């Protein structure tokens, strides 16, 4: 049974374009299915998480990451008697707007778009789901519920300054109440993302031999996990050890998140969803001690993994590809597919740049590499 402060699909604020309710799926389940059936969702399997898609078969990509985030989000929401369907749906959609080549690709495209209001993967997710996906005759996008769109846009908190151009424009026709917090389910999806990526980036980095267990000792709490596991399992292999460490890490993070969130619910005496939105802080959270551990782990990953020689070398190649493609399309729009070229408003430079950015952002790693090799 859903809590009184949960997002109830029967009380959804609805869709921009009204539709007849489905007889066997609730509104958030319908949204989940719509997202899964988008072209953008399928392309995630060929988009970088940390390691380039062709670097190895077992490294995570944007699709596997999104599935892992959705699993964590669903479990946490279920335990708190919140809408697991909504939490899962937001989690599945949270990375749809990412460029090829992960954050290196996004930084490169944002630099290309510096004179055209920049590029944001979060805003791009909204744009994909409300404009760029063409699956219905009656409208652009996939016509998701207000709650899902709110969660995608505001899962990291209220947006009160430097509002992205597309988010601001869309908000005029469908007010997402940008100055408030999103639902508890959206907040869960955001922290499920943190739990998943710090855990699994550690795992993948060990597998790629970018870091080892000696360097992991810099994280004292992780070193304690390693010591306890080696003491319990004398002959444990390195490959099994990292799986056990990640399992322990995820369990402790999820347990901590549940405890602190329940404390906040009780402290604030929350009875309905609007009270969550109007709080002056994020309701769903970790304890202060765990937040410090997460910050420490993110710093470790940034210094030891994302700035490592291997990842830096790959990032430089990816930057060259994205910037090269942007330049070649800006120089000659006839190189764009006809259906994309038709979206440009009379060859006006701002419109041209935005359409090109949308096109490049939608590419998979391998498609971008192929296009670069053909055109640059």
Swiss-Prot record:
What the entry lists under Pfam families is as follows: HD, HD_assoc
| Keywords recorded for this protein, A-Z | Hydrolase
Q: Does the keyword Transcription apply?
A: no
GO MF terms held by the record: dGTPase activity
> Which Gene3D superfamilies is this protein grouped with?
Hypothetical protein af1432
> Tell me, what is an example of a GO biological process annotation in this record?
dGTP catabolic process
* Domain HD positions: 62-198
Name the UniProt record assigns to this protein: Deoxyguanosinetriphosphate triphosphohydrolase-like protein
Species of origin: Rickettsia canadensis (strain McKiel)
């Amino acid at each position: 049974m859903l809590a009184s402060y949960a997002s109830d699909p029967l009380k959804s604020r609805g869709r921009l374009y009204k539709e007849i309710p489905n007889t066997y799926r609730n509104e958030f389940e319908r949204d989940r299915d719509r997202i899964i059936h988008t072209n953008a969702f399928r392309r995630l399997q060929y988009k970088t998480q940390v390691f380039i898609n062709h670097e190895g078969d077992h490294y995570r990509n944007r699709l596997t990451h999104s599935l892992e985030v959705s699993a964590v989000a669903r479990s946490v929401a279920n335990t708190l008697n919140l809408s697991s369907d909504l939490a899962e749906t937001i989690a599945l959609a949270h990375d749809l707007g990412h460029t090829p080549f992960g954050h290196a690709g996004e930084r490169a495209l944002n630099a290309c778009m510096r004179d055209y209001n920049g590029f944001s993967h979060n805003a791009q997710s909204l744009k994909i789901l409300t404009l760029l996906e063409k699956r219905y005759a009656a409208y652009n996008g996939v016509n998701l519920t207000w709650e899902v769109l709110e969660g995608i846009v505001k899962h990291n908190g209220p947006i009160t300054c430097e509002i992205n151009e597309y988010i601001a424009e869309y908000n005029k026709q469908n007010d997402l109440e940008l100055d408030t917090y999103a639902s508890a389910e959206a907040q869960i999806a955001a922290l499920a993302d943190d739990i998943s990526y710090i855990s699994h980036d550690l795992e993948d980095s060990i597998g790629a031999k970018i870091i080892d267990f000696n360097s992991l000792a810099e994280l004292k709490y992780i070193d304690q996990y390693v010591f306890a596991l080696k003491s319990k399992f004398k002959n444990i292999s390195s490959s099994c050890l990292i799986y056990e460490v990640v399992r322990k890490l995820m369990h402790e993070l999820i347990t901590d998140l549940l405890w602190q969130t329940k404390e906040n619910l009780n402290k604030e005496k929350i009875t309905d969803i609007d009270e969550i939105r109007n709080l002056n802080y994020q309701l769903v959270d970790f304890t202060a001690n765990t937040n410090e551990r997460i910050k420490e782990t993110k710093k470790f990953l940034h210094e030891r993994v994302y700035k490592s020689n291997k990842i830096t070398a790959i990032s430089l190649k990816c930057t060259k590809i994205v910037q090269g493609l942007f330049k070649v399309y800006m120089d000659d729009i006839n190189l764009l597919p006809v259906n994309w070229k038709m979206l440009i408003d009379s060859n006006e430079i701002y419109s041209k740049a935005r359409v090109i950015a949308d096109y490049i952002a939608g590419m998979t790693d391998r498609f971008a590499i192929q296009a670069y090799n053909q055109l640059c």
